[in-house]
Curated annotation (Swiss-Prot):
It comes from Canis lupus familiaris. Residues 224-307 are annotated as: Transactivation domain (TAM). PROSITE patterns: HMG_BOX_2. The keyword DNA damage does not apply. The gene is SOX9. Residues 105-173 bind DNA. Transmembrane segments: none annotated. A motif (9aaTAD 3) lies at residues 464-472. GO terms for cellular component: nucleus; protein-containing complex. A motif (9aaTAD 1) lies at residues 275-284. Transcription factor that plays a key role in chondrocytes differentiation and skeletal development. Specifically binds the 5'-ACAAAG-3' DNA motif present in enhancers and super-enhancers and promotes expression of genes important for chondrogenesis, including cartilage matrix protein-coding genes COL2A1, COL4A2, COL9A1, COL11A2 and ACAN, SOX5 and SOX6. Also binds to some promoter regions. Plays a central role in successive steps of chondrocyte differentiation. GO terms for biological process: cartilage condensation; cartilage development; cell fate specification; cellular response to BMP stimulus; cellular response to epidermal growth factor stimulus; cellular response to heparin; cellular response to mechanical stimulus; chondrocyte differentiation. Residues 341-380 have a biased composition (Pro residues). Residues 56-67, 160-174 have a biased composition (Basic and acidic residues). This is Transcription factor SOX-9.
Length: 513
């Protein structure tokens, strides 16, 4: 009976396929056919009664199966089955599990298979807890480590088996079975393996394409405040694809804050983003930028950048310290190199990063006289440690500034435009040429360009360009600031102070769509 049962199932399925009628909706006219298409389940249930099966079991099975089909179908099926004599169905003899008359002949074993079969038996007896797959891997590794003399007995045994096989099956041809078409699960698995090796660029492009506002791909990255209505947060620039967590959510987890309602995420903390991953390939693929506006962040070939003309406070060009009110004076020292950029004056001690914006304070907070910069000994990595200009000597922060060697013409040209050439003692840097220009007063005397004291307040976006006291030169942000990030490096201002910075287009924000 066990032999016949699978065969009956198979013939039923074949006839189902031939008749083309799906089993739950058996048509009435199939009643004339000897083996009705819709009765797959019932035919199997009635057959065991012929085969001296105890009657209770098929009946139980039948009852559970009957729930699947409507009453009319069941009646039609039983009508057909009543008049059919199952003894007339021819039963072909099945040999070795294949429907062909001749049994399937296996290939003779090769040397490795001889070794693996013998070794697997031995190991499986000794270590019954070993998983079969692990066992196979181990056997493969061991086989590769064997030398010729150790392999010889297995090779000889394999040769003997091959000769024997040829005697037994003289007309044997190796006919590998056709592979079945790839199942969905397998395809998904393959896709998954492909996706584990996706470059960050591809992820970035996909993020851009998926986002509903992808008309301005990069803009979204820098302006999370706009997307308050979105269910998922704005796409963030890719970190390396080691984790599947969306980078924005990972930041939230690190900061330990719950996600606010409405899917609105706090601004991205760029300390955790490796901007070096945003390679030039990615940046060249973003066609939605206003190129002219973007150019103001790029270091020009020896000429000062064009100052921006927004109503809001911007850095004119890039690192130059000047508010838009003082643009004519400020335009000269716009592209100060990073070595020359003055270190930030320390914020007043009473102010926490999250503090609300303070009104401009009285001038005592501002430095009274232009202090002398004291050059510290240069660090071995060419990252200079400058002591900050501060009226309170106790508050000396050390600022590490990565240097990029810019052309000497860059320095000298930018010095020609400086309004006041009052030179302090030049930096004594052994690894730079004597053409390194003296530091001019105009770059240090903040009170020339600022409303007095207003650059201390963290949210003084309206009053000054010292965006939270020049904090994007902080040691916390500098290490990731790779040269490629000159094009996209402006985002490395820490957005931990208050999300309201995002409401107005400060200099990090590019075009509004």
């Amino acid at each position: 009976m066990n032999l016949l049962d699978p065969f009956m199932k198979m013939t039923d399925e074949q006839e189902k396929g031939l008749s083309g009628a799906p089993s739950p909706t058996m048509s009435e006219d199939s009643a004339g056919s000897p083996c009705p298409s819709g009765s797959g389940s019932d035919t199997e249930n009635t057959r065991p009664q012929e085969n001296t099966f105890p009657k209770g079991e098929p009946d139980l099975k039948k009852e559970s199966e009957e729930d699947k089909f409507p009453v009319c179908i069941r009646e039609a099926v039983s009508q057909v089955l009543k008049g059919y004599d199952w003894t007339l169905v021819p039963m072909p003899v099945r040999v070795n599990g294949s429907s062909k008359n001749k049994p399937h002949v296996k290939r003779p074993m090769n040397a490795f298979m001889v070794w693996a079969q013998a070794a697997r038996r031995k190991l499986a007896d000794q270590y019954p807890h070993l998983h079969n797959a692990e066992l196979s891997k181990t056997l493969g590794k061991l086989w590769r480590l064997l030398n010729e003399s150790e392999k010889r007995p297995f090779v000889e045994e394999a040769e003997r088996l091959r000769v024997q096989h040829k005697k037994d099956h003289p007309d044997y041809k190796y006919q590998p079975r056709r592979r079945k078409s790839v199942k969905n699960g397998q395809a998904e698995a393959e896709e998954a393996t492909e996706q584990t090796h996706i470059s960050p660029n591809a992820i970035f492009k996909r993020l851009q394409a998926d986002s509903p506002h992808s008309s301005s791909g990069m803009n979204e990255v820098h302006s999370p405040g706009k997307h308050s209505g979105q269910s998922q947060g704005p796409p963030t620039p890719p970190t390396t694809p080691k984790t599947d967590v969306q980078p924005g959510k990972a930041d939230l987890k690190r900061e330990g804050r719950p996600l606010p309602e409405g899917g609105r995420q706090p601004p991205i903390d760029f300390r955790d983003v490796d901007i070096g991953e945003l390679s030039s390939d990615v940046i060249s693929n973003i066609e939605t930028f206003d190129v002219n506006e973007f150019d103001q962040y790029l270091p020009p070939n020896g000429h000062p950048g064009v100052p921006a003309t927004h109503g809001q406070v911007t850095y004119t060009g890039s690192y130059g310290i000047s508010s838009t009110a003082a643009t004519p004076a400020g335009a000269g020292h716009v592209w100060m190199s990073k070595q020359q950029a003055p270190p930030p004056p320390p914020p007043p001690p009473q102010q926490s990063p999250q503090a609300p914006p303070q009104p401009p304070q009285a001038p005592p907070q501002a430095p009274q006289a232009p202090p002398q910069p004291q050059p510290a000994p240069p660090q071995p990595q060419a990252a200079h440690t400058l002591t900050p200009l501060s009226s309170e000597p106790g508050q000396a922060q050390r600022t590490h500034i990565k240097t990029e060697q810019l052309s000497p013409s860059h320095y000298s040209e930018q010095q020609q435009h400086s309004p006041q050439q009052i030179a302090y003692s030049p930096f004594s840097l052994p690894h730079y040429s004597p053409s390194y220009p003296p530091i001019t007063r105009s770059q240090y005397d903040y009170t020339d360009h600022q409303n007095s004291g207003s650059y201390y307040s963290h949210a003084a976006g309206q009053g000054s360009s010292l965006y939270s006291t020049f904090t994007y030169m902080n040691p916390a942000q500098r290490p990731m600031y790779t040269p490629i990030a000159d094009t996209s490096g402006v985002p490395s201002i820490p957005q931990t102070h208050s999300p309201q910075h995002w409401e107005q287009p400060v200099y990090t924000q590019l075009t509004r769509p």
